[in-house]
Amino acid sequence: MALSDSIGDFLARIRNAQLAMHKTTRVLFSKVNSSILKILKDEGYILDYQKEVVGNIPSFVVKLKYYERSPVISDIVRVSKPGCRCYSKYKDISKAYNGLGIFIISTSKGVMTDYDAHKLKFGGEILCRVF
C-alpha cells in the first residue's frame, strides 16, 4: 500500500512513540524527513537520529528526548495536509505558542524554522507546528 502523506506518518510515529515513552522510534527515510529531523535536533526536541538500512529499505532511527519523565515534544501537529495546503508569506508567519514552539516551513531555499524564514524573508508551505 502506498503512503499518501509521508510527513504525516513521520509526525504520528514520533508523537505515538513519545506518548508510549519509547527511547527510540523508526521513521521512513526521505529528504524532507531528514531536514525536519535536523531542525528538531538543532532546536533540542530530539537527542539524535541516524540513517539505517534494514532489508534494503532506508529509514531513520530517532532517539527521543524526555525531561523529568515527560516528553520534550508535547505537541507536534501537521499544518499543511495533502488535501489542504497551507502557505504563508514571511510577513504573516506568527510565532508558535508565543515563541515557545516552532513552525517548520518548506521554502524555496529548503526546510527551515519560522524564525529563520522570517529573518531571511522567505515564505512557504507550513509543514508542521512543534511545541
Curated annotation (Swiss-Prot):
Which molecular-function annotation in GO is an example for this chain?
structural constituent of ribosome
Q: Which PROSITE patterns match?
A: RIBOSOMAL_S8 (PS00053)
**What keywords is this UniProt entry annotated with?**
Ribonucleoprotein, Ribosomal protein, RNA-binding, rRNA-binding
One Pfam assignment: Ribosomal_S8
SUPFAM superfamilies found in the cross-reference section: Ribosomal protein S8
The cross-references to Gene3D superfamilies, in alphabetical order and at most eight, read:
3.30.1370.30, 3.30.1490.10
Tell me which GO cellular component terms the UniProt record holds: ribonucleoprotein complex; ribosome
Q: Name one GO biological process term.
A: translation
Q: Which InterPro entries match?
A: Ribosomal_uS8, Ribosomal_uS8_CS, Ribosomal_uS8_sf
Q: Which HAMAP family match?
A: Ribosomal_uS8_B
Q: PANTHER family in the record, alphabetically? A: 40S RIBOSOMAL PROTEIN S15A (PTHR11758)
Q: What does this protein do?
A: One of the primary rRNA binding proteins, it binds directly to 16S rRNA central domain where it helps coordinate assembly of the platform of the 30S subunit.
The family assignment reads:
Belongs to the universal ribosomal protein uS8 family.
Relate the assembly described in the record. Answer: Part of the 30S ribosomal subunit. Contacts proteins S5 and S12.
Official protein name in the record: Small ribosomal subunit protein uS8
Specify the species: Wolbachia sp. subsp. Brugia malayi (strain TRS)
Encoding gene, per UniProt annotation: rpsH
